[in-house]
């Protein structure tokens, strides 16, 4: 997984056969972008027909179902990705299209660490206005190993912090309103100017809407996500193992719609915080028999709306 050309583990679905992952901001289902939902379709099925799991236990948005903003597990926390597009066993309920299961990392007998950083600062340094507005930074870290003085207990910790100064960036033409903001021109005014102004062909494009005052690149919204994962593994005996894991995600996004092209402050914001605690107990009875007990607590809080904004400047 670490060597794949992906920035987010949700892009793993793009690499699977028969899967279409729709970019909500481009051509997705209406309102899915506002809700921060991922659209993953398997062989023509709906996005809500996939069972998403971490270490064999379900995760999903408790209101809309599926996954999306606020349900990101950093890639240094994933040891293996199990994907079953149909034909899965009856043990997997609430799934018609596919089953997705992330097997998480565990600490080993030796200390290990990983670090990765991506940024748009290089493009900005080369003079790219687009990269300057984008202001993209992505940090990935992972480390783990045995806990000192407790050889039977191993720890793994990983985290990812992603920040983008603009959710979407558009390039506008250089035709802007060159007059006072409150000065409007009716169709009759423009017709008179066309007939009387000798320089009409040179200045006619300046008589645009008074709110059209931007030229070049402009960013809208933002997207910030931080998630971290920790896992303790206790090898009680060669036949008994206890695992405790904790996963936390804090996501804050402000998307963009053309309705808010001239008043981005009125666009909805999405706060979505996820917390998952899990306990797993493995007991190997003999060479042919074993059992596993799992319990987890998955909580996802969210706020969608406009906050702390004076929408009419009164």
Place the predicted regions along the sequence by residue.
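Periplasmic N-terminal accessory/gating domains of Gram-negative outer-membrane beta-barrel systems
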Residues: 1-90, 94-99, 119-126, 138-140
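Extracellular loop and loop/strand-boundary signature of outer-membrane beta-barrel proteins
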Residues: 66, 125-129, 213-218, 261-268, ...
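Transmembrane beta-strands of outer-membrane beta-barrel proteins
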Residues: 111-115, 153-157, 242-244, 291-295
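Transmembrane beta-strands of outer-membrane beta-barrel pores
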Residues: 117-123, 161-165, 248-252, 297-301
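Transmembrane beta-barrel wall of Gram-negative outer-membrane proteins
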Residues: 132-252, 272-286
């Amino acid at each position: 997984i670490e060597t794949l050309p992906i920035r987010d583990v949700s892009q793993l679905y793009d690499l699977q056969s028969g899967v279409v992952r729709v970019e909500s901001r481009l051509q997705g289902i209406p309102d899915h972008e506002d809700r921060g939902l991922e659209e993953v379709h398997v062989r023509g099925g709906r996005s809500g027909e996939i069972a998403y799991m971490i270490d064999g236990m379900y995760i999903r948005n408790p209101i809309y179902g599926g996954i999306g903003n606020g349900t990101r597990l950093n890639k240094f926390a994933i040891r293996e990705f199990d994907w079953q597009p149909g034909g899965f066993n009856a043990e997997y309920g609430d799934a018609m299209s596919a089953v997705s299961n992330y097997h998480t990392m565990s600490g080993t007998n030796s200390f290990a660490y990983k670090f990765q950083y991506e940024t748009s600062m290089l493009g900005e340094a080369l003079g790219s206005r687009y990269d300057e507005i984008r202001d993209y930074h992505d940090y990935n870290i992972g480390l783990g190993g045995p806990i000192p003085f407790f050889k039977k207990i191993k720890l793994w910790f990983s985290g990812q912090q992603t920040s983008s100064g603009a959710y979407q960036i558009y390039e506008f033409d250089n035709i802007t309103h060159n007059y006072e903001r409150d000065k409007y021109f009716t169709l009759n005014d423009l017709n008179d100017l066309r007939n009387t102004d000798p320089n009409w062909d040179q200045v006619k494009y300046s008589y645009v809407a008074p709110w059209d005052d931007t030229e070049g690149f402009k960013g809208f919204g933002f997207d910030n996500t931080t998630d971290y994962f920790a896992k303790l593994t206790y090898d009680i005996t060669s036949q008994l193992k206890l695992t405790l894991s904790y996963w936390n995600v804090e996501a804050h996004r402000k998307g963009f719609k053309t309705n808010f092209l001239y008043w981005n402050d009125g666009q909805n914001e999405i706060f979505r915080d996820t917390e998952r605690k899990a306990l797993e107990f493995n007991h190997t009875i003999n060479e042919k028999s074993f059992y596993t007990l799992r319990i987890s607590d998955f909580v996802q809080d969210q706020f969608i709306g406009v906050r702390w904004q004076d929408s009419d400047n009164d």
